[in-house]
Structures are given as structure tokens and as C-alpha cells.
């Protein structure tokens, strides 16, 4: 997969907006994009998938949260302002990204379930065991290193 500079710039803008305006290096944006792609490959390897119904339900829930909760509306409005996009552009980006976001969350959940089964822990999405959370984060953090030999950075 080839990552174009326009995608890197877009990711930098997103990461900067999410971090309160902090500057993001190209390399950090590229690494984040690569981790996201690798997570999708891992999810597919485990047989995970996302339905259009799941995407539609999550999109509707996000729009409802915007309408129902002032703090959500304020956060999204501030994000749009800092990213220099309209609310419609924000929702278009969310809708385009949701299948991958949901699939990455399913991967996290599956890794957590596997860890809990191996360690005789109860898997929960709310207040999950700390050991499980550390395992999942360490697993995901190691993905880039696992695939580093297959990655070529170009200018």
C-alpha cells in the first residue's frame, strides 16, 4: 500500500486537532496510518468484518450524541474549527472512516477476549481488566515493529 502525501497531511491535521493543536511530524502521521492499516490486516486475518448495518447504527448514534449532548456538540464544533472543516465535511469523513474504526475496535475486543480466555478472566468492554488492557496495547504497539521489515519510507 502506498501512502500519498495528501493522506499524510490529512492525518497530521487530524492528529493535531485531536491533540489540542500540537504539531505532528510526517513520520508520526505515517506510522499512525501504517498501524491502522496493519490493524485492518490483523482483523481480517482473524476473520473479523463489519456490516453496513453496524456502520449505519454507529453513524446515527454519533449524530444523535451531537444533537443531544452540549459537551459533544462543543467538542465537535471546536474540532471542526481547528481542522478548518465544516460539520458536513466532518460527518462525511466520519462516515468514510467508520468501517475501519469499527473493525479496529473489533480487533481490540477479540484480542481482549483471547487474553481473558487464556488467563481465566472475565472479558468486559466497560472497566476491562488492567492486565488485558496492557496486553492489547502492547500487542498493537508491537505491530509496527513486527512489519517494519516490509515497510519502505520514501520522500
Question: Where are each of the predicted segments found?
Answer:
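A C-terminal, polar beta->alpha supersecondary segment
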Residues: 95-155
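N-terminal targeting/tethering segments
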Residues: 1-94
Amino acid at each position: 500500500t502506498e501512502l500519498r502525501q495528501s493522506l499524510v497531511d490529512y492525518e497530521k491535521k487530524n492528529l493535531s486537532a485531536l491533540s489540542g493543536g500540537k504539531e505532528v511530524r510526517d513520520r508520526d502521521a505515517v506510522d499512525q496510518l501504517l498501524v491502522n492499516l496493519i490493524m485492518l490486516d490483523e482483523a481480517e486475518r482473524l476473520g473479523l468484518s463489519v456490516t453496513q448495518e453496524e456502520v449505519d447504527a454507529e453513524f446515527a448514534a454519533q449524530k444523535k450524541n451531537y444533537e443531544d449532548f452540549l459537551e459533544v456538540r462543543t467538542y465537535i464544533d471546536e474540532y471542526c474549527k481547528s481542522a478548518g472543516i465544516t460539520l458536513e465535511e466532518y460527518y462525511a469523513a466520519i462516515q468514510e472512516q467508520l468501517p475501519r474504526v469499527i473493525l479496529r475496535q473489533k480487533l481490540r475486543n477479540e484480542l481482549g477476549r483471547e487474553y481473558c480466555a487464556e488467563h481465566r478472566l472475565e472479558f468486559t468492554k466497560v472497566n476491562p481488566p488492567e492486565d488485558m488492557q496492557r496486553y492489547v496495547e502492547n500487542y498493537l504497539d508491537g505491530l509496527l515493529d513486527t512489519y517494519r521489515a516490509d515497510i519502505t519510507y520514501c520522500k
